[in-house]
Each structure stands twice: as C-alpha cells, then as structure tokens.
Design a protein with these regions (language model features):
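A short, N-terminal "cap"/entry segment at the start of jelly-roll beta-barrel domains
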Residues: 1-44, 59, 131-145
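Ligand-binding loop in jelly-roll beta-barrel domains
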Residues: 92-93, 101-128
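Short glycine/proline-enriched turns and hinge-like loops at secondary-structure junctions
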Residues: 44-45, 63, 91, 110-112
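A short beta-strand-loop-beta hairpin characteristic of the jelly-roll/cupin
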Residues: 57, 66-93, 103
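Short, solvent-exposed loop/turn segments that connect beta-strands within catalytic domains
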Residues: 40-42, 84-86, 112-115
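Residue-level recognition of conserved beta-strand positions in structured domain cores
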Residues: 49, 62, 81-83, 109, ...
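Short, well-structured hydrophobic secondary-structure segments
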Residues: 50-58
Length: 145
C-alpha cells in the first residue's frame, strides 16, 4: 500500500429532467444517460433509463461486448431472442434481467396503455448495434391489456 496521494474523481448528481439522450439508440427504445462518460467522470460503466411507449416493440439489436443488467422500474415488458427471435422472457415491475454480450434481442412493452421504463446498466459502455433485415418470427405475445 502506498501513501502517495491520488486524484479523486468528483461525486455528481444527474437531475431527472436534464438527462441527455444516450449516444446509442434503437427505434422504440429511447435511452437516456444517467451515469455515463457524457455526464460524469465514470470509466467503464453506463447506467441509464430506457423508455418504451405503450404497445411499442424495439427493432432487433445487440450490445456488442457489453454486459447488460436491467431492472423493470415501471410497467411490464418482454425480451425476444434466439433463432428468429422465437424465445421470449416476460418481466414485471421489480424484476431484473441479464443480457449477455452479442445476444441479438428485441424489447417490447406488454401494455397498450402504460409506458415501460427500464433502469439499465452496461459495462464497459452503452454499445448499441442495430440489426437490419432480420427474419423475425410472428409469435403470440401475452399482452396485459
């Protein structure tokens, strides 16, 4: 252990009504940066909010080498993945989800009347790779309303 002084980073607060749009976006999954390189001195972490409107379903995408942890803050959602996005996980308020690196997926809101809000964290950053011309299966979704 050394007694050499080290430069400490500053603590900071990002106000909810001042959050910037995150650099990586996907249609119908609007990301806002909370703790990020755009708003703080953080290195190797992105933490923000993701909004999906009533009945909306995102385009297919993945997050490169980033590991993603999500928390359903408000509403009910689903994530589709796997071959032709035929596998589905359902989530409700208070649930956590892990999305491994490079896994293509689609996020959706299970309600046609309420907004879905996720709290999402990624390491090392908010990497978003949108996937075009994907073969997406037509499956039944268990909407809540």
């Amino acid at each position: 252990m050394t007694d050499a002084p080290q430069e400490l980073k500053k603590l900071s607060v990002q106000r909810k009504d001042e959050l910037p749009m995150a650099p990586g976006q996907t249609a119908k999954a609007r990301r806002y940066s909370g703790v990020s390189v755009e708003t703080t001195e953080v290195e190797g972490l992105w933490f923000g909010k993701v909004y999906t409107g009533p009945g909306e379903v995102s385009d297919p995408h993945h997050h490169g080498e980033a590991e993603t942890g999500g928390y359903v803050f408000k509403g009910n959602g689903f994530i589709r993945f796997g071959e032709r996005y035929e596998d589905i996980l359902y989530m409700s308020e208070g649930d956590f989800v892990y999305v491994p690196p490079f896994v293509p997926h689609i996020e959706g809101n299970l309600s046609h009347t309420e907004e879905l809000v996720w709290m999402t964290t990624r390491t090392p950053d908010n990497i978003v790779v949108n996937l075009h011309d994907q073969d997406v299966a037509d499956i039944d979704i268990a909407y809540v309303d």
